[in-house]
């Protein structure tokens, strides 16, 4: 008797329930060997004051099954609510987001008939961590966190993906000409790991020109690996230029769990109208079937879906009077796909997936390298002061007993404003005061607390402390513009 794989199903918000019903209908007709557990997440939970959008009972289901098929959810805009997508990815350590984009030319409109690429997006770090602060009346902060181990995991995954899927080239996109530490480590690790895969070509693009090339010459790309926010943006670009963002599915892969979802959002403006394209979620379900070792069902469904597209049976988002034969709604599209189960596409590439379940490599032990000698050499103390000039701040601070420190610079938004010509000023209430060790004196954490006490006594409102370190004598901090 065939073994049925337990799957957690989340219907989501907006168009989520109707496209999920369409996909489940196809899965049933294709006789997918799955057993469903349904959970409630998203907007309904937010309204019940679950700020994360998910309940403990839902987590228990996910822990039991290890696999989630999730329709889009609506995250309320503004403060007070965290993105459920990000919460699930981070909690389950789903470090890799795989987003294929393939042209269906000539059956859908696209300027790029040869587009066939996959974006591998880091899924746990970067600005997407959502660590934010309001520090003054005027200034807001969002932290960009990138780890060496996180870069190792996603870049190695990208090269392994290329090997397993007969891809020829992996390209890394970053902005390390500006963010030399956070984006710099991504590029550095990419270059190191690329040497282990001599059979795979590799290249690096700065994210801005890389995105421009992706939009105009996507055929030069094969596998793209990048950080979280960049990956989110460029995968939507790739999906849109392939024909429609409504076609793209994605997989979120970790060591022990996996989540599959459409790339697009919940589209509440068209919810309940039976016009949404279920193809994105269907393609996510196909990726799920491959992942759990049901390549036969994945092959059956994908070929039927492609035959439906070839026959010109299209939802409104890809319907074209010149090339489409029939405009259908969400439910009817699903019915048309099931009518073609067992049929093969004649022009689009035929699917043929293996029956072996995908497993993550478990023999790589990612450890934090602590060999470099770490030395405390200074501290950046951010202060909230409403003054017209950085020189006013310097005058006030330099009257204090700074102990083993000396005030080296004052900057705002990364621009050095003291010591500097007073003609160069800015409107700000958020200032970074850089204190360095005086005459090579050894600094201890107690020295910093004494410095903070001196600032507090002088009624200087300090709002953040960033200590400055050297690693094997190399500065682990950036300089301000003009420093």
Curated annotation (Swiss-Prot):
Assembly and oligomerization: Homodimer.
Record-level GO BP terms: glyoxylate cycle; isocitrate metabolic process; tricarboxylic acid cycle
UniProt site positions, description: Critical for catalysis: 128, 175
Positions contributing to D-threo-isocitrate binding: 83, 85, 89, 99, 121
Name of the molecule in the record: Isocitrate dehydrogenase [NADP]
Record InterPro entries: IsoCit/isopropylmalate_DH_CS, Isocitrate_DH_bac-typ, Isocitrate_DH_TT1725_C, Isocitrate_DH_TT1725_C_sf, IsoPropMal-DH-like_dom
Keywords attached to this entry: Glyoxylate bypass, Magnesium, Manganese, Metal-binding, NADP, Oxidoreductase, Tricarboxylic acid cycle
UniProt KW Nucleotidyltransferase keyword: no
The protein's required cofactors: Mg(2+); Mn(2+)
Free-text remark on how the cofactor is bound: Binds 1 Mg(2+) or Mn(2+) ion per subunit.
Annotated SUPFAM superfamilies: Isocitrate/Isopropylmalate dehydrogenase-like
Keyword Signal: no
NCBIfam families to which the protein is assigned, alphabetical: ICDH_alpha, PRK09222.1
Gene that this sequence comes from: icd
Residue numbers binding NADP(+): 74, 264-270, 277
Pfam families: Iso_dh, Isocitrate_DH_C_bact
């Amino acid at each position: 008797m065939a073994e049925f794989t337990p799957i957690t199903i989340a219907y989501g918000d907006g168009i989520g329930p109707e496209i999920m019903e369409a996909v489940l209908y196809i899965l049933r007709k294709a006789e997918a060997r799955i057993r469903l557990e349904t959970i409630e997440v998203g907007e309904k939970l937010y309204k019940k004051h679950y700020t994360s959008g998910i309940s403990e009972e839902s987590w228990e289901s996910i822990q039991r099954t290890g696999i989630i098929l999730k329709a889009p959810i609506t995250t309320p805009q503004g403060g007070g609510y965290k993105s459920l997508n990000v919460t699930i990815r981070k909690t389950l350590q789903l470090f890799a987001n795989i987003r294929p984009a393939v042209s269906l030319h000539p059956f859908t409109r696209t300027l790029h008939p040869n587009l066939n690429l996959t974006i591998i997006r880091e899924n746990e770090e970067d600005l997407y961590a959502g660590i934010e602060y309001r520090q003054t009346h005027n200034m807001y902060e969002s932290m960009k966190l990138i780890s060496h181990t996180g870069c190792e995991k996603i870049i190695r995954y990208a090269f392994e993906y290329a090997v397993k899927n007969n891809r020829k080239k992996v390209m890394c996109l970053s902005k390390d000409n500006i963010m030399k530490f956070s984006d710099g480590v991504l590029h550095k690790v990419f270059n190191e790991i690329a040497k282990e895969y001599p059979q795979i070509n590799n290249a690096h693009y700065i994210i801005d020109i890389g995105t421009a090339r992706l939009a105009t010459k996507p055929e030069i790309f094969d596998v793209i690996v990048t950080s979280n926010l960049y990956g989110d943006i460029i995968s939507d670009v790739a999906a849109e230029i392939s024909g429609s963002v409504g076609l793209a599915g994605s997989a979120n892969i970790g060591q022990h769990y996996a989540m599959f979802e459409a790339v697009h959002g919940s589209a509440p403006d068209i919810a309940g109208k039976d016009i949404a394209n279920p193809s994105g979620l269907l393609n996510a379900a196909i990726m799920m079937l491959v992942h759990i070792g049901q390549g036969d069902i994945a092959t059956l469904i994908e070929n039927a879906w492609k035959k439906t597209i070839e026959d010109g049976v299209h939802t409104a988002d890809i319907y074209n009077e010149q090339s489409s034969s029939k405009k259908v709604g969400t439910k009817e599209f699903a019915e048309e796909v099931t009518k073609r189960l067992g049929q093969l596409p004649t022009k689009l590439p035929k699917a043929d997936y293996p029956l072996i379940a995908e497993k993550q490599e478990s023999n790589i032990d990612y450890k934090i390298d602590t060999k470099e000698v770490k030395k405390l050499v200074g501290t950046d103390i951010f202060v909230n002061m409403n003054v017209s000039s950085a020189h006013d701040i310097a005058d006030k601070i330099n009257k204090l007993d700074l102990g083993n420190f000396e005030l080296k610079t004052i900057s705002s938004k990364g621009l050095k404003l003291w010591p500097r010509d007073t003609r160069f000023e800015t409107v700000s209430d958020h200032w970074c005061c850089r204190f360095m060790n005086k005459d090579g004196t050894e600094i201890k954490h107690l020295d910093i607390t004494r410095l903070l006490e001196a600032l507090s006594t002088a009624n200087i409102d300090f709002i953040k402390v960033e200590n400055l370190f050297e690693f094997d004598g190399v500065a682990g901090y950036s300089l301000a513009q003009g420093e």
